[in-house]
Swiss-Prot record:
Start-end of Polar residues biased regions: 1-13
Residue ranges: DNA binding: 106-200
Superkingdom: Eukaryota
GO molecular function terms listed in the Swiss-Prot or TrEMBL record: DNA-binding transcription factor activity; sequence-specific DNA binding
Name of the featured protein: Forkhead box protein I1c
Subcellular location: Nucleus
BP terms from Gene Ontology: positive regulation of DNA-templated transcription
Gene name in the database record: foxi1c
Keyword tags: DNA-binding, Nucleus, Transcription, Transcription regulation
């Protein structure tokens, strides 16, 4: 069988195959013969115009694979596919050397880690700023080629990071600039070039807590009087003491030091008691009405004078039946759900109840 006369041979043999085989088997057999002969012809003449039919072969195969250049199941694993396509697409890996990759790829180290590596590799464990620049440029070609301001970043890290200490130059040592050394307490923070910032934050937080504890211990001795106990750290005024004795608030000592917060929480406590009183019997409402009014008086000064006006306005409704006032009050209580609205609805019930009893 000659590969040159292959199309004419397929055209002559196609009717015979179509009579004895179904259409799917005919296409599979013809495609297999065409692929084998095309691979032989493709090894001899590798031109760009002949690559298009080879991509089309993969489309007609049953398990289609979009990655045709990887020699998957969708393409026949012939030597021509592995040598021509894979070799040309991935040939840049053989050209690029390790040094060229290092010039392109940025090293996975922070500027603080680069400074620490430079100082640790120095014989005397100290370097000047120019020597740190030289170490980074010599060991990492990316920074030698790049001009993105990495020297400014290194200079800022030296001045802002507490792990790097500035050492003045000796008088007998000629040259410019001071030396930079690494703090011995921070040597464990650098693990294989990676700077562990979490440990530094924990040490700073522990030292800050120790300073605050010392300040609190010395505060009573400086500002406290001789007759006061050392446990009393927050000052108290006579107004706050009278308010706490009269209302018996359960708020903590740190909150009661502010008069505004004291009045606010006492009014909120009175609002909570009114929500409980709403669920009690109507016979106890008259006894608790004065407490509710005094609780609202701490919240605002105008809320005490308003019920007297409501009493005069509600005098017109005293002749209503008791069951009608009860139904209207039940509807009002179901309409409002918050503590603020419950307080005023309970007060309106109080006045309506007093009018019905009279």
């Amino acid at each position: 069988m000659n590969s040159i006369h292959l199309p004419s041979h397929q055209r002559t043999s196609a009717p015979g195959l179509h009579q004895h085989r179904p259409k799917g088997a005919q296409e599979a057999s013809e495609m297999a013969v065409y692929c084998d002969n095309f691979s032989m012809y493709h090894q001899q003449n590798l031109h760009s115009s002949q690559r298009a039919p080879n991509y089309g072969i993969g489309d007609y195969a049953p398990p289609t694979n979009p990655y045709l250049w990887l020699g998957g199941p969708g393409v026949s694993n012939s030597p021509s596919n592995s040598s021509s396509f894979c070799g040309t697409d991935l040939s840049w890996l053989s050209v690029a050397s390790q040094e060229e990759l290092l010039k392109v790829v940025r090293p996975p180290y922070s500027y603080s880690a680069l400074i620490a590596m430079a100082i640790q590799n120095a014989p005397e464990k100290k370097l000047t700023l120019s020597q740190i620049y030289q170490y980074v440029a010599d060991n990492f070609p990316f920074y030698k080629r790049s001009k993105a301001g990495w020297q400014n970043s290194i200079r800022h890290n030296l001045s802002l990071n507490d792990c790097f200490k500035k050492v003045p130059r000796d008088e007998d040592d000629p040259g410019k600039g001071n030396y930079w050394t690494l703090d011995p307490n921070c040597e464990k923070m650098f693990d294989n070039g990676n700077f562990r910032r979490k440990r530094k934050r924990r040490s700073d937080s522990s030292s800050a807590e120790a300073v605050t504890v010392k300040g609190e211990e010395g505060r009573p001795a400086l500002g406290g009087k001789g007759g006061e106990s050392p446990l009393m750290l927050t000052p108290s005024s006579p107004e706050l003491e009278a308010a706490s004795d009269g209302r018996k608030s359960t708020s903590p000592s740190g909150i009661t030091s502010s008069p505004c917060l004291n009045n606010f929480f006492s009014s909120m406590t009175s609002l909570d008691t009114t929500s409980v009183n709403r669920q009690m019997s109507m016979g106890l409402v008259n006894e608790l009405s004065q407490r509710n009014i005094t609780g609202l008086g701490s919240f605002t000064s105008g809320s005490v004078a308003e019920p007297s006006v409501d009493l005069q306005d509600n005098s017109l409704h005293l002749n209503r039946p008791s069951y009608y006032s009860t139904l209207s009050s039940t509807h009002q209580n179901n309409q409002f759900n918050s503590h603020f609205y419950n307080t005023f609805s309970v007060n309106s019930l109080i006045y309506a109840r007093e009018g019905s009893e009279v």
